[in-house]
A protein has these predicted regions:
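A metal-dependent, Asp-based hydrolase signature
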Residues: 62-90
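Short, acidic loop-to-helix structural element flanking the phosphoryl-transfer center
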Residues: 90-117, 157
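Hydrophobic/basic alpha-helical segments enriched in Actinobacteria
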Residues: 45-48, 81, 198-203
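Short, surface-exposed acidic
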Residues: 47-57, 81-92, 215-217
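Asp-based, Mg2+/Mn2+-dependent phosphohydrolase catalytic module
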Residues: 2-23, 120, 124-217
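Active-site neighborhood of HAD-like aspartate-dependent phosphohydrolases
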Residues: 9-58, 189
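Alpha-helical elements of Rossmann-like donor-binding domains used by nucleotide-donor carbohydrate transfer enzymes
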Residues: 37-41, 56-59, 72-76, 105, ...
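Short glycine/serine/threonine/alanine-rich loop segments
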Residues: 48, 83, 115, 169, ...
Length: 217
């Protein structure tokens, strides 16, 4: 969806001290988690070098958050561990993500109040493309901001500044919610209101955060 508004329309929501136009939501640990069984499915390919394999996969993931192809990086990992199976067999997309439907319903409720909502997440290109194409997020969010597309990753200032440029609002009118303290600090450094979210805290954790800004679910 675009972010154009009718001339003169004011959709800000907030308390006397803070007026918000946008809420940015992190994905993993806030709106979604790894699907049950995914880790077991992945590590079965690397026994008995499971720990070493997981470290290599994690390193490939981090190296690709700002645009490098994760598929190419992972195929190199598979060669190193002498895994002959194709990548899409080793990493089954069906096991990647389990969305928290109550949290998505809460995002809809926030939008119904007149606020714009965006996904703001660090993702490598394969996982990010899967999220964009397969989870229906285009019907939930006004915008989706993936690090692999922006060329910056949280907590870099460039990540948050690029989003501010895209949505064309002052940072003081934006709330960012993330489960990693470093990312929250990065948002605050450029003037965004940042709130730390307890991992998989659900709507019970989201409601009081929003209430501090005058947004009632």
């Amino acid at each position: 969806m675009g972010n154009d508004l009718r001339a003169g329309e004011d959709t800000r929501v907030g308390c006397a001290a803070v007026m918000l136009d946008w809420v940015l939501f992190d994905a993993d640990g806030v709106l979604q988690s790894s699907r049950a069984g995914w880790m077991e499915e992945l590590t079965a390919w690397a026994a008995p070098r499971v720990e070493e394999f997981l470290l290599a996969v994690a390193a490939a993931d981090v190296a690709c958050l700002t645009g490098k192809d994760f598929g190419g990086a992972m195929r190199e990992v598979l060669r190193q561990f002498e895994i002959d199976a194709p990548l899409d067999q080793v990493i089954d997309q069906r096991f990647w993500i389990e969305v928290r439907q109550p949290m998505l319903d809460a995002v809809r409720a926030v939008r119904d109040l007149g606020l714009r909502c965006a996904l703001a997440t660090n993702q490598q290109n394969l996982r990010g493309a899967y999220m964009r194409s397969s989870l229906g997020f285009e019907t939930i969010f006004d915008e989706q901001f993936y690090s692999f597309e922006l060329g910056f990753a949280k907590p870099e200032a460039g990540y948050f500044q690029t989003i501010m440029d895209r949505i064309n609002v002052a940072p003081s009118r934006v709330l960012f919610i993330d489960d990693l303290e470093g990312n929250v600090d990065g948002a605050r450094e450029i003037g965004i209101h940042g709130e730390l979210f307890p991992v998989d805290g659900g709507v019970a954790a989201l409601a009081p955060i929003l209430a501090r800004y005058g947004v009632q679910l």
